UniProtKB/Swiss-Prot annotation:
Residues 104-165 form the J domain. Keywords: Chaperone, Coiled coil, Disease variant, Endoplasmic reticulum, Membrane, Phosphoprotein, Protein transport, Repeat, Transmembrane, Transmembrane helix, Transport. Residues 597-635 form a coiled coil. The lineage of its organism: Eukaryota, Metazoa, Chordata, Craniata, Vertebrata. This is Translocation protein SEC63 homolog. Residues 518-536 have a biased composition (Basic residues). It comes from Homo sapiens. Gene3D superfamilies: 5' to 3' exonuclease, C-terminal subdomain, C2 domain, DnaJ domain, Sec63 N-terminal domain-like domain. Mediates cotranslational and post-translational transport of certain precursor polypeptides across endoplasmic reticulum (ER). Proposed to play an auxiliary role in recognition of precursors with short and apolar signal peptides. May cooperate with SEC62 and HSPA5/BiP to facilitate targeting of small presecretory proteins into the SEC61 channel-forming translocon complex, triggering channel opening for polypeptide translocation to the ER lumen. Required for efficient PKD1/Polycystin-1 biogenesis and trafficking to the plasma membrane of the primary cilia. It is linked to Polycystic liver disease 2 with or without kidney cysts: An autosomal dominant hepatobiliary disease characterized by overgrowth of biliary epithelium and supportive connective tissue, resulting in multiple liver cysts. A subset of patients may develop kidney cysts that usually do not result in clinically significant renal disease.
């Protein structure tokens, strides 16, 4: 058996393979993730949306932000140097000699495989004359030629070559280790051990420990754990939080505390500027002593948020702090929504009366505060202030107009172009076009709702205690798209009909957001009563004439009766025959109708089965898509005049009972709605049968006044009784019966054998 030898690389050839692979594993992923993206694409995108978003704060900050030219250049230089090193090593590896080469005697003698013995001898003579040492040839080459000649002519050498790959028989196998020899040299052992100890015992633990202690302070949504604890405590303490209390709790987040977040700053000038803003804002509940809500950082964050909602001008030194605080608000409010939902679930699972769940109003106030923070508006301000060039002074002209009383954005969109231009006459043409462009970019989302019980035979039958699944299909369009469709419909209806009916333009369809016009009320005077038609009264005859008429009628009636009896006797035979034929035809018709009804029932059942199968396949595909797909959270940019960061349109979808003010299903944060999105909301059915009225809410986290509400009716039935006898449960009994039958058969067979033996 061949021996084995392990040797370190003295020449460095094997080490180049290892080094090339190592550099390639670093350079290729680093190029994919760290290569600077094209800056021109972002500039082109900003240029295309300038008409709509040009006045937004985040857009102006993006343009004013200095372009980081040095960092992309440094990244490119480092990556190009890495690729140069990788290519150099690859070239070096391609030029190095192979460590292991298969021995081929034909190649040594410069012959083709399969040459004859005569050709081998002839070639050997020529090469031996050329490389013989006595004639000044190469001794090493001559030895190789002699060895190759022996491998092809000597039977034993040829056999060794065919079996072991070498004419001399099995050789020792050497394995090269891809490390240079100086690493294992005894002279360098102390230095190598020092480097290994420094790398694995000092640097690696420090890096891993610092990363661990830094990441353990944050949750999965990059929110400080301490912030979540603060929100949980105050939400549990205050069951019903109004907007003022909610702002206080929001400002108490540790993200605004310089002790826990290095990005949060505290300046000496805050002691002068913050009290000035407090005097301008008014009362902000400074008397309560509730740390950390009364800490300086929390007070500063609260004042900056209130000044933002009031659209107040603040000193330049506080603008940067305000922008930092506003960027954190959407994520913090989402965390507060999660905390409220967790407390509601805990209250449902516990039967303790002392543990009270937060109210639905607290949850909805969190969502409203997110809209307010993004748009920079107070709670009861008009949603029209989200539009450009519409201020408090201009708003009065719009909302208090004699003819058009516009309160919401939908009311403004539903107007005709001429009426809208008349209403906004105080705007110049350029400003009016900008307002219309912004108004057309606002989202309009429709909801299609379907409730069912999945994994059940009758999915449409909702029973007590079942898990109800409400499938909501969201379709997003812009206000401009919907309005253009309605304008085209109205224009088509206004055209005169060809048949001359000119009243078709009276019944015009209106959009989903348009208010239904109430017709004129009918007064009592306008109602005209139709005259009642009088029935003709019969003419009364004298009594003597009536008796004579009755007698005459009686005589005539007797004669007619006799004639009718004779006709009946003559027609009895023909009537009986007709009745028999009618019975036969009627029975045939009944049989045909029964077959048709059975066929229709079978077709209907097959269609129902196909529909159920398709729904099942669609639900399976939907679940697989939800598990495998990773949709981007970049949907559509939000138009916000005073928000410092580009924000995407996200929504909250949930089901609630408005009458009982309870939350039915947990809010689902829709972050991937670009055009259409399907969302499943699941909740347990009520414990008692009956009809229930719920409401499906779709709330934006960025826009005010664009929430959608749709009713949901549920008819809950009694739960089906558990079947006591089922065919699947009879398998054990059938098995016992089969076993008894087999045993009886064996007993009878044994008795027959015994009788035959007795006869013998």
């Amino acid at each position: 058996m061949a021996g084995q030898q392990f040797q370190y690389d003295d020449s460095g050839n094997t080490f180049f393979y290892f080094l090339t692979s190592f550099v390639g594993l670093i350079v290729i992923p680093a190029t994919y993730y760290l290569w600077p993206r094209d800056q021109n694409a972002e500039q082109i995108r900003l240029k295309n949306i300038r008409k709509v978003y040009g006045r937004c704060m985040w857009y102006r900050l993006r343009l004013l932000k200095p372009q980081p030219n040095i960092i992309p250049t440094v990244k490119k230089i480092v990556l190009l140097a890495g690729w140069a090193l990788f290519l150099f090593l690859a070239y070096k590896v391609s030029k190095t000699d192979r460590e292991y080469q298969e021995y081929n005697p034909y190649e040594v003698l410069n012959l083709d495989p399969g040459a004859t013995v005569a050709e081998i001898k002839k070639q050997y003579r020529l090469l031996s004359l050329k490389y013989h040492p006595d004639k000044g040839g190469d001794e090493v080459m001559f030895m190789r030629i002699a060895k190759a000649y022996a491998a092809l002519t000597d039977e034993e050498s040829r056999k060794n070559w065919e079996e072991f790959g070498n004419p001399d028989g099995p050789q020792a196998t050497s394995f090269g280790i891809a490390l240079p020899a100086w690493i294992v040299d005894q002279k360098n052992s102390i230095l190598v051990l020092l480097v290994y100890g420094l790398a694995f015992m000092v640097i690696l633990p420090v890096v891993v420990g610092s990363w661990w202690y830094r990441s353990i302070r944050y949750s999965g949504d990059q929110i400080l754990i301490r912030t979540t604890q603060i929100y949980t405590y105050f939400v549990y303490k205050t069951r019903n939080m109004d907007m003022k209390r909610l702002i206080m709790v929001l400002a108490g987040a540790s993200e605004f505390d310089p002790q826990y977040n290095k990005d949060a700053t505290s300046r000496p000038t805050d002691n002068i500027l913050i009290p000035q803003l407090i005097r301008e804002i008014g009362s902000i509940n400074l008397k309560k002593n509730e740390p950390p809500l009364t800490c300086p950082y929390s007070l500063k964050a609260r004042v900056l948020l209130l000044s933002h909602l009031a659209r107040m001008k603040i000193p330049e030194t506080l603008e940067e702090d305000q922008q930092f605080m506003l960027k954190k608000c959407p994520a913090l409010l989402q965390e507060m929504v999660n905390v409220i939902c967790q407390l509601i679930v805990m209250a449902r699972n516990r039967e303790e009366r002392e543990f009270r769940a937060p109210t639905l109003a607290s949850l909805e106030n969190c969502m409203k505060l997110s809209q307010m923070a993004v748009q920079g508006l107070q709670q009861f301000k008009s949603p029209l202030l989200q539009l450009p060039h519409i201020e408090e002074d201009n708003l009065r002209r719009v909302s208090n107009h004699k003819k058009y009383k516009i309160k919401t954005i939908q009311d403004l969109v539903s107007l005709k172009e001429s009426d809208r231009h008349t209403l906004l006459h105080f705007l110049e043409d350029e400003k009016y076009e900008e307002v219309m462009a912004v108004l057309g970019s606002f989202p309009y989302v429709t909801m299609d709702i379907k409730s069912q019980v999945l994994d059940d035979e009758d999915s449409n039958n909702i029973t007590v205690g079942s898990l109800v699944t409400v499938l909501v299909k969201l379709t997003r369009q812009t206000m401009a798209e919907v309005f253009e469709k309605e304008q085209s419909i109205c224009a088509a209806e206004e055209q005169p009909a060809e048949d001359g009916q000119g009243e078709t333009n009276k019944n015009r369809t209106k959009g989903g957001w348009q208010q239904k016009s109430k017709g004129p009320k009918k007064t009592a005077k306008s109602k005209k009563k139709k005259p009642l038609k009088k029935k003709p009264t019969p003419v009364l005859l004298p009594q003597s004439k009536q008796q004579k008429q009755k007698q005459a009628n009686g005589v005539v009636g007797n004669e007619a009766a006799v004639k009718e009896d004779e006709e009946e006797v003559s027609d009895k035979g023909s009537d009986s025959e007709e009745e028999e034929t009618n019975r036969d035809s009627q029975s045939e018709k009944d049989d045909g109708s029964d077959r048709d009804s059975d066929r229709e029932q079978d077709e209907k059942q097959n269609k129902d089965d196909e529909a159920e199968w398709q729904e099942l396949q669609q639900s399976i595909q939907r679940k697989e898509r939800a598990l495998l797909e990773t949709k981007s959270k970049i949907t559509h940019p939000v138009y916000s005049l005073y928000f410092p960061e580009e924000k995407q349109e996200w929504w909250w979808l949930y089901i609630a009972d408005r009458k009982e003010q309870t939350l039915i299903s947990m809010p689902y944060h829709v972050c991937t709605l670009k055009d259409t999105e399907e969302v499943e909301l699941k909740f347990p059915a009520p414990g008692k049968p009956g009809n229930y009225q719920y409401t499906v809410f779709l709330r934006s986290d960025s826009y005010m006044g664009l929430d959608q509400i749709k009713p949901l009716k549920l008819e809950v039935h009694e739960a089906k009784p558990v079947p006591e006898n089922h065919p699947q449960w009879d398998t054990a009994i059938e098995g016992d019966e089969d076993q008894e039958d087999s045993e009886g058969f064996e007993d009878s067979f044994e008795e027959e054998e015994e009788e035959e033996e007795d006869d013998d």
